[in-house]
Amino acid sequence: MELISSSTIGNSALCLTLISILIFFFLTTTTIPTFPDHPLRSLLDDSQITTNSSSIVNPKSSCVSSRSHDNGGVINYFSLHYCIFNENLFFSIPILSLLILLHFYILIKTAQTHFSTVTTKLADRLNLSPSMAAVTLLALGNGAPDVFASVAALRGGQYRTGFGAILSAGTFVSAFVVGFVAIYAAPFPVDAASFVRDVLFYLIAALFLFYVYLSGEIFVWQAIGFVGFYIFFVGFVFWMDFGTNVEKGKSISEEEKDLLRLQDCEIAAGSLGSYKAEKEHQFSGIFRLYGTISRMWETPVSVLLNLTIPKPSPSEWSRFYRSANIVFCPFALLYTCNSFVQLNHPISFLFPNTHLPLWLVVLFMTSSLAFLHFTVEKQPPKTEQLPVIVVAFIMSVFWISTIAGELLNCLAALGTLLKLPPALLGLTVLAWGNSVGDLVADVAVAKAGRPAMAMAGCFAGPMFNMLVGLGSALVMQTANVYPDAYKLGFHVGIVIAFVFLLLSLMGSLLVITWSRFRVPRFWGICLVGLYVAFTFVSLIIASVST
């Protein structure tokens, strides 16, 4: 029992501290600009299609109105078309297409060279098993956009949108992302107890939510039960893994650690390029074109990411980049919390009667610290530092979430310019937007040699969104009407989403169990086909209802 003494308590305390920081990082804002608040992200609420589509994807065809059309992101893509290119589709379509490729490149680059690396290092430093890392690190990292979207939707009175967003994202991850991971990495084994536990807990949570939705009302104790159920799930995961660690005497074998270190080195050396080289013979034309384009922005993107995401490894340490991290990392976090604390918020600094904007004060303080670091620190640290790994993890999540939001806005603008139907946009572009980060991150983790962690994250992440994200939002709403119940309306689209979500979960449980807990590639193809069927059925329902 010595293993569950001081080291276990210390690691648990560090993990709880990290969770608290990330929850504050994601949930203290009400309108985070990097997570676009699109009511049609799931488009299971067809009433929103006709009433709100104009405010989302149909700005007036003028430069002035397009500038006033706030898409909640960094770049206003409609202004590019109406103001810069003077409504010339010959220029707008290629530029927006290139921007979409750029967004995908940054997503893949961030996930493979930073997120998967620091997640592996952080799990290793905290002695977390793949399951423990999945229910904490991957769930928090992948689920942040959907948690925010759910809270914002229900606080705005759009309960149907909140349910639809969670269910469509859950179906996307449990069907399409799991299928993609299976197609890429299969066949690979999964731990029988952990897999059955994760899927069963997710099934129970989905069935409980389905029951509550069909009842048409929810009480505050039921909403609290959602959040409490996930806390119980995390505790159960830790209890199971701690018991396994005591029996084995260690959480991760030395061989696995050596493999992870080797994979980290391979990723840092540029696994994205090697992956493209492996697949180039299959799709030579596409990859040759994409490779030519990506080489043009490889250096600028790498420099930008290195300026904002610290490198934990001493062998990759750079005095210039580490000093730049001290300046830019606080600014990125400050930008994320812009709605909570305005960048131009006046504060007294140095002199009582002098009011300076917050961003200027932060710039002065971080620049001073960066200059001090640059002049004092001459040698890299001898070992990897846990605070640096934590900051790198948070900044990787920041970039994945930010670029996923920009990709969503750019795709929505391109679809509007191509005059695609709003229902089709909602069921494809807007439904996939915030889940692109899940796809890229989980596939990157699988590519880093940990498909079991990626598989666990595919179930723990959506369950975190459902129980913590939607549960927290429902707690707020039910508390406002306590002791009465919060009323829920019926919509056939949400029932269809429940059905496909339950089909994907029960199918994975049966097929993988039948395959002796090895994930077969054919099941990945079936899951992708299941999601395609869900998209078509939902599109038909949305069109008929409209």
From Swiss-Prot:
GO terms for biological process: potassium ion transmembrane transport; sodium ion transport. The chain crosses the membrane at residues 13-33, 88-108, 134-154, 163-183, 194-214, 218-238, 323-343, 356-376, 388-408, 423-445, 455-475, 492-512, 522-542. It comes from the Eukaryota. Keywords: Antiport, Cell membrane, Ion transport, Membrane, Potassium, Potassium transport, Sodium, Sodium transport, Transmembrane, Transmembrane helix, Transport. It holds the Pfam family Na_Ca_ex. GO terms for cellular component: nuclear periphery; plasma membrane. InterPro entries: CaCA_antiporter (IPR051359), NaCa_Exmemb (IPR004837), NCX_ion-bd_dom_sf (IPR044880). One of its GO terms (molecular function) is potassium ion transmembrane transporter activity. Membrane-localized H(+)-dependent K(+) and Na(+) transporter. PANTHER family: CATION_CALCIUM EXCHANGER 5, NA+/CA2+ K+ INDEPENDENT EXCHANGER. This is Cation/calcium exchanger 5.
